[in-house]
A protein has these predicted regions:
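Acidic donor-binding segment of Leloir-type glycosyltransferases
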Residues: 20-61
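Short, well-formed alpha-helical segments that are part of the catalytic scaffolds
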Residues: 10-23
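Short aromatic/hydrophobic "clamp" motif used to bind/position activated sugar donors
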Residues: 84
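Glycine-rich, basic loop-to-helix element that forms the pyrophosphate-binding segment
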Residues: 60-79
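The conserved acidic donor/metal-binding loop of glycosyltransferases
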Residues: 88-92, 117
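Conserved nucleotide-sugar donor-binding catalytic segment
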Residues: 4, 116, 134-219
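Conserved donor NDP-sugar-binding/catalytic core segment of glycosyltransferases
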Residues: 96-130
Length: 221
């Protein structure tokens, strides 16, 4: 079973995000949406979906960009699945995302972390570019070298983690503004058995004018 967590704040693309998850060909999952005390009307968007797999919670106080890791780990705290995915509220999944990861996990059950290629899309969902292909299996040191030298474009929703690994390591690595928190969490997960990669673009990662980037910084474009 997969648990997909959306730390939600922006309304603009949330419907599309949720719809892409509920349209998965692999059906054994739960969708956790944690509204980070958004000033936008997320309740109405979520209420349009009548699906018992949705768990919806609203924070009393906004974590904000500086403490965004708190909301990432809040999503994780609700999860009951064996594998966990953290989803950007403006990204979308290919309908075969979970099915492809499920098949790959069966081949490499010892691994703590899995990854896929991504389409980078614009505000109108047009594809701008495709991220690089990787080896099917890569060690921690190889991945770090390629990442630090600019040969690995990766985000957050393109990773699938073994939930027990995240729980045992106190969730996603804490840094203010989530600076490199996603990368450090992935490196920790790769330590023992590397990372397993699917060379198919299963995530649509949206480049928008204001977003929290994959390195945790606030991008203004």
């Amino acid at each position: 079973k997969f648990s997909i967590g959306i730390p939600a704040y922006k309304a603009k693309y949330l419907y599309n995000c949720i719809e892409s998850i509920l349209n998965q060909t692999y059906k054994n999952f739960e969708l956790i949406i944690v509204n980070d005390a958004s000033p936008e009307d997320l309740d109405t968007i979520v209420s349009r979906f009548n699906d018992e797999r949705i768990i919806y919670s609203t924070n009393e106080k906004n974590y904000g960009a500086e403490e965004v890791i708190g909301n990432w780990n809040k999503c994780l705290s609700f999860a009951t699945g064996e594998y966990f995915i953290l989803m950007g509220d403006d990204d979308t999944l290919d309908k075969h995302y979970l099915e492809e990861f499920y098949k790959t996990i069966q081949e490499y059950p010892e691994s703590n972390v899995f990854h896929c290629r991504s389409n980078i899309i614009d505000e109108n969902s047009a594809i701008i570019s495709l991220t690089q292909s990787w080896p099917q299996r890569e060690s921690l040191l190889d991945n770090m070298w390629h990442r630090l030298n600019g040969f690995r474009q990766q985000f957050i929703s393109d990773f699938v983690y073994k939930r027990n690994f995240l729980i045992e390591n106190n969730g996603f690595f804490y840094n203010k503004l989530a600076w490199a928190s996603d990368d450090i969490t992935a490196y920790q997960a790769m330590r023992d058995n590397g990372i397993i990669h699917i060379n198919k673009a299963l995530l649509n990662y949206r480049r928008s004018p204001i977003t929290i980037s994959s390195s945790g910084s606030v991008e203004l474009k």
